[in-house]
Amino acid sequence: MSLLMITENVKLAREYALLGNYDSAMVYYQGVLDQINKYLYSVKDTHLHQKWQQVWQEINVEAKHVKEIMKTLESFKLDSTSLKAAQHELPSSEGEVWSLPVPVERRPLPGPRKRQSTQHSDPKPHSNRPGAVVRAHRPSAQSLHSDRGKAVRSREKKEQSKGREEKNKLPAAVTEPEANKFDSTGYDKDLVEALERDIISQNPNVRWYDIADLVEAKKLLQEAVVLPMWMPEFFKGIRRPWKGVLMVGPPGTGKTLLAKAVATECKTTFFNVSSSTLTSKYRGESEKLVRLLFEMARFYSPATIFIDEIDSICSRRGTSEEHEASRRVKAELLVQMDGVGGASENDDPSKMVMVLAATNFPWDIDEALRRRLEKRIYIPLPSAKGREELLRISLRELELADDVNLASIAENMEGYSGADITNVCRDASLMAMRRRIEGLTPEEIRNLSREEMHMPTTMEDFEMALKKVSKSVSAADIERYEKWIVEFGSC
């Protein structure tokens, strides 16, 4: 069960309620309430627990409103059924006399056609009899039912408007803002939907403080993405925002994590693009996808296009192994990036589109693309201070024994990448559990209590994990990255 599932179910419940499908809405509301109840058992933070309890109460109020609407509609159905039964029981003899109704003001009908007939020109004989009362018009059951239906619809509209107001009052943990829709005229609908799926509308929930070290990279990304929206009058002319940033470094150093932090912190539309997004088996569609991607980014600006492993899309041109279709895609990507819409083409820097790229093979990237990615920064292996900070971030949810010395562990991790350090922490956190279940049967393992499983991690566990987990980056690779960044870097 995830928070994303709760959010989607709340959205579906409200949509069904607004559309009048109250049975389906109640199913989703009940499911959301059950999901939140289960989630509350896993929340240990008191403040967060109170917030989610408040969310549960507000959603429960919505569900009660929907139940009241369903009861009201059910009562209307019963009334209409009894009215039809009474209509069938009315006598149909011509001899009975109806009482005169209350006069009702009626609007004149536009241009009624008169029937010319000699049969009904003479009045009926019984209308001239003394004491006889002419049968008056009696409102039919059908008209009463239509009036009642209008009342039901007006009440439903009031409930819908009330539901919208309550939706606006709910916390941001559940509600989502509605965005403008991109006009897909001239493009294949499937292509537009494929790119819209790559827009990260949900929060990746990675903050700047979740990333250890990499201070210079954080400052550069904030300068390239955040500051132009805060100070648009400053970032004009030669100070226009950077159109492209390339992150270069060994695997596991935090390049993709920095991109997630940009999507979380910078409040821009974030496109997560890979090689599968921009390739198609049909001739010419890959180039259309590239152009459509940038047009959508300009529409949803300010926007950030993150291309992970960009060397797989835009490798060096002119090689013997290059295919014609691949060359056309690279050409379209280069053309679109040169007109991405910085201050040189758009007077408002807050409507910028920035390309953020990451690669482990910078030497394979095309020279023209390297020129368009104006900032080329090196994401190195973490320093001793960064390794210790990363250990604290990875172990903040674990209970550590008193003998654990993080500084000593960080010193023993020289040459480890961020991903390697995370693997060491994960392996060390499982050591106590492995010792506890050693020699037990599956039935005995299932009967273990929670306290027995959650034992503190000791220094010995980290020493054993370091022996099992080796570093994944060689010294020769580091030397090659440093040589490239000295020659082509732009920090």
From Swiss-Prot:
Subunit structure comment from the entry: Can homooligomerize into hexameric rings, which may be promoted by interaction with microtubules. Interacts with KATNB1, which may serve as a targeting subunit. Interacts with ASPM; the katanin complex formation KATNA1:KATNB1 is required for the association of ASPM. Interacts with dynein and NDEL1. Associates with the E3 ligase complex containing DYRK2, EDD/UBR5, DDB1 and DCAF1 proteins (EDVP complex). Interacts with KLHL42 (via the kelch domains). Interacts with CUL3; the interaction is enhanced by KLHL42. Interacts with KATNB1 and KATNBL1.
Family: Belongs to the AAA ATPase family. Katanin p60 subunit A1 subfamily.
Key word Isomerase present: yes
Biased composition annotated in UniProt, kind: Basic and acidic residues: 145-169
UniProt cross-references to InterPro entries, sorted A to Z: AAA+_ATPase, AAA_lid_3, ATPase_AAA_core, ATPase_AAA_CS, KATNA1, KATNA1_MIT, KTNA1_AAA_dom, MT-severing_AAA_ATPase
PTM sites of type Phosphoserine: S42
Organism: Rattus norvegicus
Cellular component, GO, one term: katanin complex
PROSITE patterns (alphabetical): AAA
GO terms assigned for molecular function: ATP binding; ATP hydrolysis activity; dynein complex binding; microtubule binding; microtubule severing ATPase activity; protein heterodimerization activity
Effect of K255A: Abolishes ATPase activity
Activity control: ATPase activity is stimulated by microtubules, which promote homooligomerization. ATP-dependent microtubule severing is stimulated by interaction with KATNB1.
Gene: Katna1
Stretches for region Interaction with KATNB1: 1-29
Protein name, UniProt field: Katanin p60 ATPase-containing subunit A1
Record field: catalytic activity: n ATP + n H2O + a microtubule = n ADP + n phosphate + (n+1) alpha/beta tubulin heterodimers
Chain intervals for the UniProt region annotation (Interaction with dynein and NDEL1): 1-75
Subcellular location: Cytoplasm; Midbody; Cytoplasm, Cytoskeleton, Microtubule organizing center, Centrosome; Cytoplasm, Cytoskeleton, Spindle pole
Region Disordered, residue ranges: 87-183
Function: Catalytic subunit of a complex which severs microtubules in an ATP-dependent manner. Microtubule severing may promote rapid reorganization of cellular microtubule arrays and the release of microtubules from the centrosome following nucleation. Microtubule release from the mitotic spindle poles may allow depolymerization of the microtubule end proximal to the spindle pole, leading to poleward microtubule flux and poleward motion of chromosome. Microtubule release within the cell body of neurons may be required for their transport into neuronal processes by microtubule-dependent motor proteins.
Keywords: ATP-binding, Cell cycle, Cell division, Cytoplasm, Cytoskeleton, Isomerase, Microtubule, Mitosis, Nucleotide-binding, Phosphoprotein, Ubl conjugation
Domain of life (superkingdom): Eukaryota
Residues annotated as binding ATP: G249, P250, P251, G252, T253, G254, K255, T256
Domain notes: The N-terminus is sufficient for interaction with microtubules, although high affinity binding to microtubules also requires an intact C-terminal domain and ATP, which promotes oligomerization.
